């Protein structure tokens, strides 16, 4: 499968697996809630309040069970706002649960969806919550990069640019925005340069919770059409970027390290989509690109730095060979046609010539037809070639 098709299929599979059936979650006591405490830490101790399998609410999970764990306080960020939920492990004195994704449930509950990989755990147990540091760190890099990207797009393209959607996970970022045409290579390069400049400036990323009125006074951007409560969280990267955002971010833009746009395309009328990479994703992208160039250079029997010149020379050689081939085909066609002066016939005052040639394609038949038209003057020309299939041309002189 094409990488983009495979990636889309994987995302569909991910989206289809959201833990237990919704009716199972409806059975949970609505008074039970969860609190997210993971903006500044990746581990915490908490009490298990709910356990479910994929079919029902249960009191305990045993090794091999797939299900959902709910605790009163968690450092796991749930999927929302375009950010993919955290992965990691939940440990108790008797067992270990691998968290494959974290989801937001009704009533303020946060569900940790995954598999019981060791022992067992029960409702009421004290659990140690551990988010995967690498997973969170890479997701944060991509999320913070989308904020820099939006501001860079508005700087290069204009203030009409507004976010229409986004998705971030540890591997890449996707950003949808309003714009009336495809971006030029120069515009994409300018946006990349701006983002990488802000990364190099090592700008501290500051978050603050304030009233929505206070947030608007700071110039922070809100997502169009989004509903906000009385208080909002504002993520600021110096004076360059300020946005309403509840997601997790790097502490400093320098943590993003690198930024690279890998695609820009339209997804709807007036909406464009950028896919991009950061840090290790960029390094991997260039490593794969370098490998491709080396393979191409090997096939072309040239050094990588000479590949462009080699390809240009090969193209010139191909054009020359094609031209020579056309000349040879014309000569062969003329030879196949032979001397036709004696083949010209006349019926009721109309001259005509009918002949057969072998090994001639349709293009050469037309050329031969033009040649014979010149010889016959006013009349009809019919040429037939049979090389597995019948090809013919019939040309009447212009006067007829």
For the regions a protein language model found, what residue spans apply to each?
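Single conserved hydrophobic/aromatic residue that forms the stacking wall/gate
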Residues: 2-9, 13, 392-400
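Divalent metal-coordination and catalytic microenvironments
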Residues: 81, 147, 175, 234, ...
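Conserved nucleotide-binding/hydrolysis modules and their immediate coupling elements
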Residues: 21-129, 369
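Terminal appendage regions of diverse proteins
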Residues: 1, 17-18, 160, 253-394
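Conserved phosphate/anionic-ligand binding catalytic regions in large, soluble enzymes, centered on
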Residues: 74-87, 141-154, 240-258, 267-269
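Conserved catalytic alpha/beta cores of large enzymes that bind or transform nucleotide phosphates
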Residues: 95-193, 197, 280, 284, ...
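Non-catalytic interaction/regulatory segments
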Residues: 14-45, 170-267
């Amino acid at each position: 499968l094409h990488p983009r098709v495979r990636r889309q299929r994987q995302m569909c599979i991910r989206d289809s697996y959201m833990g237990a059936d919704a009716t199972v979650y409806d059975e949970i006591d609505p008074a039970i809630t969860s609190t997210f405490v993971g903006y500044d830490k990746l581990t915490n101790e908490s009490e298990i309040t709910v356990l479910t399998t994929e079919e029902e609410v249960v009191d305990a999970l045993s090794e091999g069970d797939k299900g959902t764990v709910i605790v009163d306080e968690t450092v796991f960020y749930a999927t929302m706002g375009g950010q993919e939920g955290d992965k990691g492990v939940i440990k108790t004195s008797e067992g270990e649960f691998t968290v494959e994704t974290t989801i937001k449930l009704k009533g303020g509950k946060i569900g940790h969806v995954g598999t019981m990989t060791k022992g067992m755990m029960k409702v009421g147990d004290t659990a140690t919550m551990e988010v995967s540091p690498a997973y969170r760190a890479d997701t944060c890099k991509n999320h913070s990069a989308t904020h820099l990207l939006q501001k860079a797009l508005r700087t290069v393209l204009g203030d009409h640019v507004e976010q229409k959607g986004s998705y971030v996970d540890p591997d890449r970022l996707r950003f949808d925005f309003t714009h009336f045409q495809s971006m030029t290579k120069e515009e994409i390069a300018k946006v990349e340069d701006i983002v990488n400049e802000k990364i190099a400036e090592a700008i501290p990323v500051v978050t603050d919770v304030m009233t929505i009125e206070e947030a608007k006074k700071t110039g922070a951007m809100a997502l169009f059409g989004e509903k906000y409560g009385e208080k909002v969280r504002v993520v600021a990267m110096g004076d360059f970027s300020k946005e309403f955002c509840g997601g997790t971010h790097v502490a400093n833009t320098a943590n993003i390290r690198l930024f690279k746009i890998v695609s820009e395309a339209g997804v709807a009328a007036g909406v464009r989509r950028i896919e991009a990479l950061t840090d290790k994703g960029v390094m991997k992208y260039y490593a794969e690109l370098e490998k491709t160039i080396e393979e191409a250079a090997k096939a072309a029997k040239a050094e990588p730095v000479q590949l462009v010149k080699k390809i240009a020379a090969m193209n010139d050689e191909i054009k020359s060979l094609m031209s020579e081939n056309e000349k040879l085909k014309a000569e062969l066609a003329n030879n196949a046609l032979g001397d036709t002066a004696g083949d010209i016939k006349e019926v009721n005052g109309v001259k005509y010539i009918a002949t057969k040639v072998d090994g001639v394609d349709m293009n050469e038949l037309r050329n031969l037809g033009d040649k014979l038209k010149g010889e016959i003057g006013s009349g009809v020309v019919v040429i037939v070639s049979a090389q597995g299939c019948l090809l013919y041309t019939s040309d009447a002189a212009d006067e007829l």
